[in-house]
A protein has these predicted regions:
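Conserved P-loop
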Residues: 1-71, 127-129
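Non-transmembrane, aqueous-exposed alpha-helical and coiled segments at domain scale
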Residues: 73, 78-79
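Detector for Asparagine
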Residues: 16, 22, 46-47, 76, ...
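Generic beta-sheet signal
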Residues: 3-5, 32, 79-84, 116
Length: 136
């Protein structure tokens, strides 16, 4: 399942993500992973959650993010929930690339039964049609 929180800065996307991360950590029997650029969520996220600062890995494009997610999924078969905060920022504001990323990663997530949630800072009207079904 893919879920996307979209909206402009200050619309509560990250707050919703934090609540979902912590709720997932309380109920999962596997591993919860949260990817962000920087470490602003370190005090907000349950300490059992694997919090990854993507900037430590020089990920700057949607293609690189896809490779990173594939690597995480292949190395950790027990991931049940994957969260990405500010996905569009991680992808250098490349909306087309992010759209390709979401469509490419979907079958991998479904095959492994991984719940996937990401936030993107964008006006709702500018969300590509292929991503609109995932809007939360």
């Amino acid at each position: 399942m893919i879920k996307i929180f979209a909206g402009l800065k200050g619309s509560g996307k990250t707050k919703n993500l934090i609540e979902l991360v912590n709720a997932a950590q309380e109920t999962t029997s596997g591993c919860v992973v949260c990817i962000e650029k920087g470490s602003k969520l370190i005090h907000e996220i349950n300490n059992k959650t694997r919090l990854v600062d993507i900037s430590e890995y020089a990920i700057e494009t949607a293609e690189q993010l896809y490779g990173f997610v594939c690597g995480a999924l292949s190395a950790n078969f027990d991931i049940t929930d994957l969260f990405i905060d500010s996905a569009l920022k991680i992808c250098a504001e490349d909306l087309e690339g992010l759209e390709k990323f979401a469509n490419a990663v979907k079958p991998l997530l479904e095959a492994r039964n991984v719940n996937f949630t990401m936030t993107i800072s964008i006006e709702l009207e500018k969300v590509p049609a292929s991503l609109k079904p995932y809007l939360a």
